[in-house]
């Protein structure tokens, strides 16, 4: 999906349109800080529909694998992306109203020029772990050289206290 796909989200939902494709991880610029490398692609499906009350919705599904940087050892860790979410499209007037907590899914503005790539990137960012890391013991994280051999900053105080 190197060319940005722009949809009129209310019309897309009303028509029940389905958009499928792949998105290269390298195209998601806001992910660069957490990625180990930008290899791979994510498959996506965006489906428009209306709920029982006639309100437009988008169903998103994103699947694939990307390589994040482990925060323990700074090496690569494979992260499976498996997103299935529902977004209700709301007009400007609806956005100002009280939100029903029983309502499933999130609410986004109904946009006549919605960038699908940006929407998918937003969902991937929201699904990422706060601090990606390998399982305990599976990581090659080692203390920095010399760490542990240098006395702590309060060791002199501990000696004075003993005297």
Q: Regions from the language model: what does each represent?
A:
Residues 52-69, 122-137:
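Immediate flanking context of iron-sulfur cluster ligation sites
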Residues 73:
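Conformational-control "hinges and anchors"
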Residues 1-16, 41-43, 78-163:
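Charge-rich, low-complexity linker and terminal segments
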Residues 1-67:
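A positional/architectural concept
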């Amino acid at each position: 999906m190197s060319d940005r796909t722009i949809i009129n989200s209310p019309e897309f939902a009303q028509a029940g349109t389905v958009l499928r494709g792949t998105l290269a991880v390298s195209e998601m610029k806001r992910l660069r800080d957490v990625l180990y490398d930008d290899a791979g692609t994510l498959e996506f499906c965006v489906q428009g529909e209306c709920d029982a009350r006639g309100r437009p919705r988008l169903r998103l599904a994103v699947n694939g694998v990307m390589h994040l940087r482990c925060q323990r050892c700074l090496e690569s860790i494979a992260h499976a992306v498996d997103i299935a979410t529902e977004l209700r499209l709301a007009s400007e007037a609806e956005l100002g109203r009280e939100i029903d907590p029983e309502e499933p899914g999130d609410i986004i503005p109904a946009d006549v020029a919605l960038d699908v790539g940006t929407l998918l990137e937003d969902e991937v960012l929201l699904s990422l772990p706060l601090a990606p890391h390998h399982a305990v013991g599976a990581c090659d994280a080692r203390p920095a050289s010399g760490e542990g051999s240098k006395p702590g900053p309060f060791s002199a105080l501990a000696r004075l206290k003993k005297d």
